[in-house]
Amino acid sequence: MAKRQLPVHKNEQRDITITDLTYEGMGVAKVDGYPLFIANALPGETARIHVMKVGKKFGFAKVIERYQDSEERVPLRDEDGLRTGTMALQHMTYDAQLSFKQKTVQDSLAKFVSLQDVDVKPTLGMSDPWAYRNKAQVPIGQDDQGRLFTGFFRKNSHSLVPITNYQIQLPKIDEMLQTVIQILNEYNLTAYDEQTHQGLIRHLVIRQGYHTDDVMIILVINGDELPHQAAITEAIVAQIPNLASLIVNHNTRRTNVILGQEETLLYGEPYYRDQMLGLDFMISAKSFFQVNTPQAEVLYQQALEVGDIQADDVVIDAYCGIGSISLCLAQRAKHVYGVEVVSDAIEMAQANAKMNNLGNVTFVAGKAEDVIQEWQAAGIEPNVVVVDPPRKGLASTFTDTVIELAPEKIVYVSCNPATLARDMNRLVAAGYHAETVQPVDLFPQTPHVECVTLLMKNR
């Protein structure tokens, strides 16, 4: 069989028109039906491009010259954000970003006949969509003079781009990153090289309480000990205001997972504190806590409102983590049962419930489907189930358990429209219906979007 002749070839230059966007926000141009994906390009724009890579089904190109700009284009704030992929949408007006995210959700649902009539509301955005992240986790490099620097990996590569202003992190976090790097550079420490598995400093993680200003600093090292530990600790404590926790995390594995299993507390407590909707939370190094606090409060408020949580409701919060949604629910419901597979998170959730004087909440560590069946056997009958799963969505065994449980309402908080649509389709087939999905923008300048939807049991 003759090899199919592609309409473009690598290193070719040609003029194109952008007709669409991918779900990652890349521009799409088609040459005789063959799609080219192009960063920093918007629908309606015409440009001269250079073809970078050609595959059987699609290729990648870059813009050499734009002939016509979209009305939805704004000047780039930082080209490094495009090179690294940390701000893939920064060339779009913020209104256009919000519309893009609404359309991403609509397109995901439209792939299923059962969901094509579900109304996707306009995305709830921020008044200022910059400098919002309460958490930084940045790789550390080393320059030709042997000095450490903060950066981020160039997209689809192992090449580290030096960065000091990340644009989307809280400004104090960017300042603290440089302060800590300056301290480390006084002791001639080496940066980890993932190619050779040599060098010490892998990542620097800083978390800051949005409402409290509490700071947690985590030095991730490829080793058992941090040289000059006492002097480095003393310097960081002296120069970082509101330091609540200083930790060395030991990660000696060949992996791109940032945190290792073992950690050593150098100063303070093994947690920092922040607030969410007026509740206090202790947050450990490995605990999940939404990185955009103001928008997380919007997200959780939406979950409470669409679920219409009442004083006689019995609620199960699956994937409950440290209890950030559970405790918000417990302020309204009769009782909340939280389940989470990570036992450390459950210990933190129990401590958070106690700290907030909430006695109507029970936390159990285990697989959600197993624990829910145990609760059923014990006579617990929830009428509301809240889920906030990771990007891979609900495990099929968990979905089976929820269908068997048959709660009146399922409140689904999602960080991935594709798996949300897949899971909604299964639940609709099992006798539920959804009327609306509410997108919320927790990650401005990026293609990521969170959603809240209510699924009601058919009567």
Regions found by a protein language model. Give the residues of each.
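Terminal RNA-binding accessory module
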Residues: 1-81, 363, 370
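Short, acidic/hydrophobic/Gly-rich beta-strand patch recurrent on exposed beta strands
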Residues: 27-32, 151-154, 218-220, 349
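Short, aliphatic-rich beta-strand segments
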Residues: 206, 213-222, 280-284
